[in-house]
């Protein structure tokens, strides 16, 4: 294996967001440090960048410089490559013939994802590892999970409000209730980083709602992966494995009430389509392509984004 330090300048291709590609052996090194699925989304950008600049797909992915918050002390000391702990590669032929990959938008509308292209990438690079599959098997047995009769609710709180507008937890409750009224034999799986939101769903739906008890939650608005080891109460590398396991499991549900963010994006990427997905967008509103109000809200949001980009440019002019 060639490490970033061993490659010569002519063999290294610097990428955006602390990425590096070894032209010699086709290894993609990701150095992005953020939330788990933020790092995964940036890796997708890297793959697209390598394909655009070299005409080839990376042969392998190396996460020895990434996932700072998702490695234990030994893995940190040894600069372990975390890829094989979290993921399992699929067939190399899966992406044969792929000549272009769009830049995935984690704050976008998930209905418009190019699922055909990204499905090939997911198949080749991002199959859940055997450890992740083992967690899934345990949870399916423990909770009697039947994905075909499950409504997954994915609510991301804590610091997410600093990035975008959030719909209220009650709005998620309302959407879950509407689906449950149409499918009274279904159950709700609530996955959230906020204890108060989890408690709300249990209070509203009682025995028809359940959650994965192994997944940590925050009680004070602290981002879960930034909790200290005593509060997290689990091995950090194992926590990363569980994030892969629970997110891919959520993707299999018959219905998903989803937020907008990196984890939400990866639910859809593993799902491979947006059918049965209810999304609250980056404005905090419900994505409804049949509503005039939705288009007005999106237009206003895009205009505000364009204005924010224009104002600094105008201010910098003499």
PLM region descriptions:
Residues 186-280:
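Donor-binding and catalytic core of enzymes assembling or modifying cell-surface/extracellular glycoconjugates
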